[in-house]
Amino acid sequence: MAKKAKVQKELKRQELVAQYAEKRKELKEKGDYVALAKLPRDSAPSRLTRRCRKTGRPRGVLRDFELSRIAFRELAHKGQIPGVKKASW
């Protein structure tokens, strides 16, 4: 389980990215890179990391489910993810 502070920090980054998205787009179209550099660092979308919705784990996150591989496996074995079943061939 990730520290609560790390998860909160990531949520704050997501809010900043959403807040400054339009302004960033306008500045990029103008080519005003000086003004773009003066925006908050955390407002850049490249600073976002994908985290597990259940545990907050930053590594091994499956994009389609937004769960870490560990949380995905647990829920899949319990049958709590619709449409997912154990493969056999």
From Swiss-Prot:
Its BP terms in the Gene Ontology are: translation
GO function terms (MF aspect): rRNA binding; structural constituent of ribosome
The record's disulfide annotation reads none
Q: Which domain of life is it from?
A: Bacteria
User: What Gene3D superfamilies does the database record attribute to this sequence?
Assistant: 30s Ribosomal Protein S14, Chain N
Which is one Gene Ontology cellular component term of this protein? small ribosomal subunit
User: Which key words are in the record?
Assistant: Ribonucleoprotein, Ribosomal protein, RNA-binding, rRNA-binding
- InterPro entries assigned to the protein according to its UniProt record, in alphabetical order: Ribosomal_uS14 (IPR001209), Ribosomal_uS14_bac/plastid (IPR023036), Ribosomal_uS14_CS (IPR018271), Ribosomal_uS14_sf (IPR043140)
Q: What would be one Pfam family of this protein? A: Ribosomal_S14
**Quaternary structure per UniProt?**
Part of the 30S ribosomal subunit. Contacts proteins S3 and S10.
Can you tell me which family this protein belongs to? Answer: Belongs to the universal ribosomal protein uS14 family.
Described function: Binds 16S rRNA, required for the assembly of 30S particles and may also be responsible for determining the conformation of the 16S rRNA at the A site.
Q: Which PANTHER family has this protein been placed in? A: 30S RIBOSOMAL PROTEIN S14 (PTHR19836), SMALL RIBOSOMAL SUBUNIT PROTEIN US14M (PTHR19836:SF19)
Q: Write down what this protein is called.
A: Small ribosomal subunit protein uS14
Where does this protein come from, organism-wise?
A: Shouchella clausii (strain KSM-K16)
